[in-house]
Swiss-Prot record:
GO terms for molecular function: carbohydrate derivative binding; D-sedoheptulose 7-phosphate isomerase activity; zinc ion binding. Its EC number is 5.3.1.28. Gene3D superfamilies: Glucose-6-phosphate isomerase like protein, domain 1. The gene is gmhA. This is Phosphoheptose isomerase. The reaction produces a racemic mixture of D-glycero-alpha-D-manno-heptose 7-phosphate and D-glycero-beta-D-manno-heptose 7-phosphate.
Length: 200
């Protein structure tokens, strides 16, 4: 086997090792996140999601699977990725500051009882941290997907929030667990709404 193949395999092995470790420490906060989301949507609320770069893609991924479906047919669930409207983002970034692009949307769209899914691998993304502050001002629950100890965002969370913090320092590995956590969240919400289905 060549060095390149060995390096590629190392990525797979490292990712698998982290996921096994994360299964032990993240199952409880993910289950708590499921309950927070269920309480929100069954009361007629919605989930707002945000992030930057790969985390923005994860926010869109989550919203697509909530509004559409995950693996089973069901009515759409209310979710909005705040990073998808380029007109709003560029207007807010230009007229205010890039750190305000999500907080302003939370102020405009969020209601008490809604949930903010805040995704940042470092926990230090200024615009995501500002969105968390705005969500608290609107009496929303925050579900934070972070890594590296949670950063500034972790320090802002309250007792009613949920912190899903991946125990790793490397961005790529954290992102890989984030998308698995999102899939676990989507699956568990479906199970609670539709009943059990075998994992095959």
């Amino acid at each position: 086997m060549g060095m390149l193949e060995q390096r590629i395999q190392r990525h797979f092995f490292d990712s698998a090792d982290l996921k096994n470790q994360a299964a032990e420490v993240l199952s409880k906060p993910i289950a708590d996140a499921v309950q927070a989301v269920l309480g929100c949507i069954t009361a007629g609320g919605k989930v707002l999601a945000c992030g930057n770069g790969g985390s923005a893609s994860d926010a869109q991924h989550f919203a697509a699977e909530f509004v559409g479906r995950f693996e089973r047919e069901r009515p759409g669930l209310a979710a909005i990725a705040l990073n998808t409207d380029t007109s709003i983002i560029t207007a807010l970034g230009n007229d205010y500051d890039f750190s305000a692009i999500y907080a302003k949307q939370v102020q405009a769209l969020g209601n008490p009882g809604d949930v903010l899914l805040a995704i940042t691998t470092s926990g230090n993304s200024a615009n995501v941290v500002a969105a968390v502050d705005a969500a608290h001002d609107k009496d929303m629950t925050v579900i934070a997907l972070t890594g590296r100890g949670g950063g500034k965002l972790g320090a802002r969370l309250t007792e009613t929030d949920v912190h899903i913090c991946v125990p790793h320092e490397r961005t790529a590995r954290i992102q890989e667990v984030h998308i698995l956590a999102i899939h676990c969240l989507c699956d568990a919400v479906d199970v609670q709404l539709l009943g059990e289905q075998d994992l095959t």
